[in-house]
């Protein structure tokens, strides 16, 4: 949809959280007639901000006025299955995601990054590379936004053609895209998660992820994990059918185009020549999964003409992301690590694989239908004790506790940390990596991680 078309359109934004409010403000600012509808009560200051932006609104439920529109724009938290979206679809209204709507106004090339795990770290790292590259370039910016916590709609009108936008995009944000076209798309991995949103259909979830390259064509690039079968098949099919330039990342050798490893070094191959970028052990981020994340950032930057020395400096100097294998403190020769963002089994697998010393694992929360089978060998090999926490404590202790020499159950994070400290020996790691959502005890995974961090600091 063009800006002129938006100005002639009445749009209803569904969802009054941060991204929904940002979309409403954006559409109003460019001259659209905008109505926002939200099922729940407004958060503090939300109504006043919408008044200031000239947005009409309703909170506490959806009325018929919400469907008096030409288009619906959905906040990421609003599922397609919701009644209002289904009514809109039956009425023949066009339905778009917030990312789609914001992209209508973007003048800069977009590097869009998705995957079940690793997308926030990769987005932050890629943004760090571009910001380092542009540090001495007047008037050129790297804008990092999307699912990382900064709605695209809040920043898109600031973009210039010389900028680069680095977007973290979730499967929810990739639902209902029609024209969203990144210059570079990155697909890291796909494993079961959020399946309740997709009627427990993994293929539907995977298809949402594939939407990241749905509209790409000649001149665009897809960066994909060659070691993930679903990712490889989908990306290579899109590249062949749509004329997109494929760039693979892999831990198994060096691909024909993309990045991999040879003799302990990262090797880039983006222009039919090998560039030996840097030793693998100089990467700032630990763990197998972060090898993929680092490769993805390197390739994305290189195809956008960032020089190798900048990429090398950025990959070795990056300080990481809170709540993602965040090293909090070492106390009595025990390292305490906050991996609260690990809300699925696959993320915990990566976390356990990242350490070569014994681990005391704190896991549990609100269960997402987890199957712990794949974790059991790693727990047997690497975990000294399992401390089970939250609603799923009984299941975690039953499924994983018996695989470790010791296990226990905790009612609170403070209790969990006390038990973990008691079980740990010098040289060990105490790892909060829950495999579950936080909503049984906390507002979000950030609050859970902040609580863990604060409690660790009391041990000093």
Curated annotation (Swiss-Prot):
Pathways involved: Cell wall biogenesis; peptidoglycan biosynthesis
Any GO CC annotation of this UniProt entry: cytoplasm
Residues involved in ATP binding: 115-121
GO molecular-function terms, A-Z: ATP binding; UDP-N-acetylmuramoylalanine-D-glutamate ligase activity
Keywords: ATP-binding, Cell cycle, Cell division, Cell shape, Cell wall biogenesis/degradation, Cytoplasm, Ligase, Nucleotide-binding, Peptidoglycan synthesis
Top EC class of this enzyme: ligase
E.C. designation(s): 6.3.2.9
Catalysed conversion reaction: UDP-N-acetyl-alpha-D-muramoyl-L-alanine + D-glutamate + ATP = UDP-N-acetyl-alpha-D-muramoyl-L-alanyl-D-glutamate + ADP + phosphate + H(+)
Gene3D superfamilies, alphabetized: Mur ligase, C-terminal domain, Mur-like, catalytic domain, NAD(P)-binding Rossmann-like Domain
Transmembrane segments: none
Location of this chain's protein in the cell: Cytoplasm
GO terms classed as biological process: cell division; cell wall organization; peptidoglycan biosynthetic process; regulation of cell shape
Domain of life: Bacteria
Alphabetical list of InterPro entries matching this protein: Mur-like_cat_sf (IPR036565), Mur_ligase_C (IPR004101), Mur_ligase_C_dom_sf (IPR036615), Mur_ligase_cen (IPR013221), MurD (IPR005762)
Family: Belongs to the MurCDEF family.
Function of the molecule: Cell wall formation. Catalyzes the addition of glutamate to the nucleotide precursor UDP-N-acetylmuramoyl-L-alanine (UMA).
HAMAP family to which the protein is assigned, alphabetical: MurD (MF_00639)
Name of this chain's protein: UDP-N-acetylmuramoylalanine--D-glutamate ligase
Organism: Salinibacter ruber (strain DSM 13855 / M31)
């Amino acid at each position: 949809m063009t800006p002129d078309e938006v100005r002639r359109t009445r749009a209803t934004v569904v969802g009054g959280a941060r991204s929904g409010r940002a979309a409403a403000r954006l559409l109003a600012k460019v001259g659209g007639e905008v109505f926002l509808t939200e099922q729940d009560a407004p958060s503090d200051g939300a109504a006043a901000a919408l008044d200031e932006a000239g947005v009409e609104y309703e909170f506490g439920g959806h009325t018929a006025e919400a469907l008096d529109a030409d288009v619906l724009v959905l906040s990421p938290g609003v599922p397609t299955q919701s009644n209002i979206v289904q009514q809109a679809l039956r009425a023949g209204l066009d339905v778009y995601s917030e990312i789609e709507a914001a992209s209508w106004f973007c003048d800069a090339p977009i590097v869009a990054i998705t995957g079940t795990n690793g997308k926030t770290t990769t987005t932050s790292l890629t943004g760090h590379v571009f910001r380092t590259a542009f540090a001495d370039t007047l008037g050129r910016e790297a804008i990092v936004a999307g699912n990382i916590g900064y709605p695209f709609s809040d920043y898109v009108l600031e973009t210039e053609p010389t900028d680069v936008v680095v977007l973290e995009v979730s499967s929810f944000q990739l639902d209902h895209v029609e024209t969203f076209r990144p210059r570079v798309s990155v697909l890291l991995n796909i494993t079961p998660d959020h399946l309740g949103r997709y009627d427990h259909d993994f293929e539907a979830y995977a298809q949402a992820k594939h939407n990241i390259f749905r509209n790409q064509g000649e001149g665009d690039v897809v960066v994909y994990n060659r070691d993930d079968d679903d990712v490889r098949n989908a990306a290579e099919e899109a590249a062949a059918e749509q004329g997109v330039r494929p760039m693979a990342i892999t831990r198994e050798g060096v691909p024909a185009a993309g990045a991999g490893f040879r003799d302990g070094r990262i090797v880039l191959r983006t222009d039919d020549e090998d560039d030996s970028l840097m030793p693998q052990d100089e990467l700032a981020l630990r763990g197998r999964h972060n090898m993929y994340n680092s490769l993805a950032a390197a390739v994305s930057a290189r195809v956008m003409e960032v020089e190798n020395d900048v990429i090398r400096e950025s990959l070795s100097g990056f300080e990481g992301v809170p709540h993602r294998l965040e090293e909090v403190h070492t106390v009595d020769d025990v390292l305490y690590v906050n991996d609260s963002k690990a809300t699925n089994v696959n993320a915990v697998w990566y976390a356990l694989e990242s350490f070569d010393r014994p681990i005391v694992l704190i896991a549990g929360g609100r269960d997402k239908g987890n199957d712990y089978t794949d974790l059991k060998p790693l727990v047997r090999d690497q975990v000294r004790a399992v401390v089970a926490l939250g609603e799923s404590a009984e299941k975690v202790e039953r499924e994983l506790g018996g695989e470790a020499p010791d296990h226990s159950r905790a009612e609170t994070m403070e209790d969990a940390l006390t038990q973990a400290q008691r079980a740990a020996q010098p040289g060990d790691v105490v790892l909060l990596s829950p495999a579950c959502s936080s909503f049984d005890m906390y507002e979000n995974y950030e609050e859970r991680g902040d609580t863990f961090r604060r409690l660790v600091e009391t041990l000093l």
